[in-house]
Regions:
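Hydrophobic alpha-helical segments at protein termini of multi-pass membrane proteins
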Residues: 1-268
Length: 268
């Protein structure tokens, strides 16, 4: 029985280890492993803040929204906005302040580490707290190894890409900072929404598209590394935390307006 539990833990955490190793090795000039691991742990700690925020959010959602609009708010705000915002804050407040954070690829590595740190703790919690038997736990762990965990990892790549462009790009820095949060929230929200409306098969289309895009992103960034060498990239833009908070408010406003529209259409 104890061996079975270890096997379930192994299945739940193996995709996390595989993905973070894959991304780390893609970097031609790897980051300090200790700093990446700390970022991973900070990503895992997100669950503590969610435990505080989610009850209030769920009360709000269940009070004002029903049916399809309730599912939309659950998907795009309760899950996507809260989780992706906290990941971005880890990237901003810790990783981007490091001396070694000196090129666009670093943003991808650290964003992915934060995302997979959260994915690891979420996966273990989900596997053991939403199932009643070890057989169910194993099945859930296996299913999430090919769905939820890759989603978090690939979303980290997307977030890191735009965050890196915001810091090191030559133009449109504010736009890229907005996209560093907006795009992962949109992808994450769509993923969760498909699950809640029992259209789970569509999530694999999302994952396939994300994987294809991520491969192109890696090739593009690695080519830039090869051309520039291990030369210091000068930051072209200084990000303020107030900008991130304002972007969160903008995205939240868009989500609430969209959910209200759904409420008026389907539940009026």
């Amino acid at each position: 029985m104890l061996l079975d539990i270890y096997i379930i833990y192994f299945v739940a955490l193996l995709p996390v280890v595989f993905l973070i190793s894959y991304v780390y090795k893609k970097d031609l000039y790897p980051e300090d492993k200790r700093e990446v691991f700390i970022t991973f742990l900070l990503g895992a700690s997100i669950i503590l803040f969610l435990d505080i925020l989610i009850p209030a959010v769920e009360i709000f959602n269940n009070t004002f929204f029903k049916g399809i609009s309730n599912k939309a708010f659950m998907s795009f705000f309760r899950a996507a906005t809260l989780e992706e915002t906290l990941k971005l804050l880890v990237l901003y407040f810790y990783a981007s302040k490091l001396d070694n954070f000196d090129e666009p690829m670093d943003a991808i590595v650290f964003a992915t580490a934060a995302s997979l740190g959260f994915a690891a703790i979420e996966n273990v919690n989900y596997v053991f707290h939403t199932t009643e038997t070890q057989s169910q736990a194993f099945s859930v762990a296996l299913a999430r190894a090919f769905s939820a965990v890759p989603l978090h990892g690939l979303n980290g790549v997307i977030m890191g890409l735009f965050f890196g462009l915001a810091l090191f790009g030559d133009k449109d820095n504010k736009k890229y900072l907005f996209l560093a949060l907006a795009v992962p929230i949109f992808i994450h929200g769509i993923y969760n929404f498909f699950l809640l409306i029992n259209a789970g098969i569509l999530i694999y289309i999302i994952l396939f598209i994300l994987f294809s895009r991520s491969s192109k992103i890696f090739n593009r960034i690695r080519m830039g590394q090869q051309l520039k060498g291990h030369e210091y990239w000068e930051r072209t833009y200084t990000i303020n935390s107030s900008e991130i908070y304002m972007n969160v408010l903008k995205i939240t406003g868009i989500i609430i307006v969209g959910v209200i529209v759904l409420e008026l259409i389907f539940n009026a």
